[in-house]
Amino acid sequence: DGKTYGDPLEQASLFAVKWEYDPKSSKSKPKFSEEIKKRTWKGTPSAKILARNHFASSLQRMSVVATVQQNEGENEQTWALVKGSPEKIATLLKSKPDGFDSQYRTLAEKGMRVIALAHKVLSPGDSKRVNDAKSPLSRDEVECDLEFAGFLAFACRVRTDSEEVINALIASSNRVMMATGDATLTALHVGNEVGIAKGGLAGAAVLELEQSNNKSGGSLRWVSAKRDKDGGIQVIGSYKDLSIPQLAQKYSLCVTGESLNAASYAATTTTESGTSSESELWDYLDSVSIFARMSPDDKERVLKRLKQQGRHTYMCGDGANDVGALKQAHVG
């Protein structure tokens, strides 16, 4: 019917770049009926999808392989086109450009939902393997040694009545928390807008892994969400040395799925009876204001633990990533 359906962010990005997509041919091209400024190509560029690697929350990315013709008369090339969370895409780049982290942080601090874009041109040999049944090109081969293409930033405005509703819930002695797959700074911005968090970035303490490849509890620390004047990290203290309830009296606490699971891993000890005990963080989940970069399983686990602690849980969620947690909640 000529209309585009699907994820609102996908639709917004197509609208913004003034391209159109034909699902029958799996081909995308510019809308020349629209005025396109600073056009750098000649003729009609196009991209046709050959294969898709669908989004996976555990991977924080998705990709397509497409034939791309940039200029009229040029031969088509086979490209790998990848998008995902900036922190994940950064690990897949051949070389991370200067300013990558600072620009991402600047956008996220404004509450933007930020997606990183990257690509590479496949070799003729790899191009032939895209749909080869005997020796197909693997996802890992597609999503590696990428060139950074840029950030895609979306302004996702909150509902006008959200703050009023949340304040009413808090006033009636309900503990209100946010669990989201969005980045920490984006979540904190929205949390402050609606009253779940207080004090801006300076008023937020974030639990982070000092070394993301190390699950040792000694690498966990609380840091301020606000950088110092030189852009450096302001460390509040070690995770092991600070009382969570006392810290929550001074800061709005924010944890990520990664740090939440690392805290659990670090403090889990197996006894002779086979039982295990988890970290203090899991005993004080209700002290946390913002759960960011949470997978569907992370959200579900938090709701399940809150119920085990005798909490009556209510959850509002509108995405497929919320289904498991909604099922765990008393009211969802």
Where are these regions (language model features)?
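Cytosolic catalytic headpieces and adjacent flexible linkers of membrane translocases
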Residues: 4-5, 20-43, 62-305, 309, ...
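Catalytic core of PPM/PP2C metal-dependent serine/threonine phosphatase domains
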Residues: 8-9
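Conserved N-terminal boundary motif of the eukaryotic protein kinase catalytic domain
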Residues: 46-51
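Short Gly/Pro-enriched turn/cap motifs at secondary-structure boundaries
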Residues: 52-57
